[in-house]
UniProtKB/Swiss-Prot annotation:
GO biological process, any: terpenoid biosynthetic process
Pathway(s) it belongs to: Isoprenoid biosynthesis; isopentenyl diphosphate biosynthesis via DXP pathway; isopentenyl diphosphate from 1-deoxy-D-xylulose 5-phosphate: step 5/6
Family statement: Belongs to the IspG family.
Name of encoding gene: ispG
Record-listed [4Fe-4S] cluster binding positions: C264, C267, C299, E306
Keyword presence, Iron-sulfur: yes
Record's signal peptide: none
Keyword Iron-sulfur included in the entry's annotation: yes
Protein's name according to its UniProt entry: 4-hydroxy-3-methylbut-2-en-1-yl diphosphate synthase (flavodoxin)
Organism: Campylobacter jejuni subsp. jejuni serotype O:6 (strain 81116 / NCTC 11828)
Coiled coil: none
Length: 357
């Protein structure tokens, strides 16, 4: 299956390009109170090392806005301010922030939006029109309810409003908590404009539910060439948001990065402690950013076949096993020695690629 991405306009959030030919960026949002400067910076640091590209923060009042200015000065990542209800906070934050997200369902009048646009235009920063099925403007929800039709009307209305103000540094999100509706919303909007899309399923739930919903919705859209930046929303799971987002990009074939682990589900043929081995391998390889296929198999039935397509592989047997690299056996060892040797081969593979580059 050939992947062909929809060509969108390119904008910039800080030093991160979004749209056009830029890589699909991964975002997250802090769950600290923004006025907690140290706590917010600690979470930003965690996201930075997890591989996030952009971070969004809530701004409820001027205490948050003033704190955000200090956070921005110390942040290693571009920051977006998330604004609801009070457009004056967006105007204030536009002086130092990298991007503004507004919810057209609660930002208020056209005059409010004009003020936000003026502030963002002066700084040259983008605005995300963040349409959410749970907070559609009354004029559209009264006519269409809270479904995709209302979301489309809201998006197009607000796009035109910004364009009429000669503002084009726009990205758009069309979020619902339902995977199918999310897919429909983005698919129907895509032919109507060429602005970059921020993908996400809102209020997706805890790790398990979010992973399922986000994989279905975001994976589906990405395979259709839709999407320029994305967030996997999870209740209270910062690093996991990034990890799952990167996995969706990798397993959809859209953007290769990090380790792809192939492992068997286990059965009665297993004669080794495969479960413990997998846990160790996952933990010890999660820092790797290089695209790498590794295989950890519990018996000989599929192990050698999978190893041929892997960069590094283990084939467990009874009390012993093989370490395989690019289809060639490099070691036959006792079970207790296999994982350490395997991990050493993985690290050597990463280093050898770095030298070639």
């Amino acid at each position: 299956m050939e992947y062909k991405r929809f060509k969108t306009r390119q904008i910039k959030v800080g030093n991160v390009s979004i749209g056009g030919d830029a890589p699909i960026s991964v975002q997250s949002m802090l769950f600290t109170k923004t006025r907690d400067i140290e706590g917010s910076l600690e979470q930003i640091s965690r996201l930075y090392f997890a591989g996030a590209n952009i971070v969004r923060l809530a701004c409820l009042d001027m205490a948050d806005a003033r704190a955000l200015k200090e956070i921005k000065a110390k942040s290693p990542l571009p920051l977006i301010v998330d604004i609801h209800f009070n457009h004056n906070l967006a105007v204030y934050c536009a002086e130092f922030i990298d991007g503004v997200r507004i919810n057209p369902g609660n930002i208020g009048s056209k005059e409010n939006i004009k003020e936000v646009v003026k502030a963002c235009k002066e700084r040259g920063i983008p605005i995300r029109i963040g349409v959410n099925h749970g907070s559609i403007e009354k004029q559209f929800s009264d006519k269409f309810g809270y479904g995709v039709d209302a979301m489309l009307e809201s998006a197009m209305y607000n796009i035109k409003l910004l364009e009429d103000l000669d503002f084009f540094d726009i990205k758009i999100s069309m979020k619902t908590s339902d995977a199918q509706k999310t897919i429909e919303a983005y698919e129907r909007l895509r032919p109507l404009c060429d602005y970059p899309f921020h993908l996400g399923v809102t209020e997706a739930g805890t790790k398990f539910h979010s992973t399922v919903k986000s994989s279905i919705a975001l994976g589906n859209l990405l395979l259709k060439g839709i999407g320029d930046t994305m967030r996997v929303s999870m209740t209270g799971e910062l690093e996991e948001e990034i990890r799952v987002a990167r996995a969706i990009l990798q397993d959809s074939g859209v953007q290769k990065s990090g380790v792809n682990i192939i492992s068997c589900p286990t059965c009665g043929r297993i004669q080794s402690d495969l479960l413990s081995a997998i846990k160790i391998v996952e933990e010890k390889t999660k820092h790797i950013k290089e695209p790498l296929n590794i295989s950890v198999m519990g018996c000989v039935v599929n192990a050698l076949g999978e190893a041929k397509g892997a960069d590094v592989a283990i084939a467990f047997g009874k009390n012993q096993g093989l370490v395989i690299r690019h289809g060639e056996v490099v070691a036959k060892l006792k079970e207790s020695e296999l994982v350490d040797r395997f991990l050493a081969e993985v690290e050597d593979e990463v280093k050898s690629r770095a030298v070639k580059e």
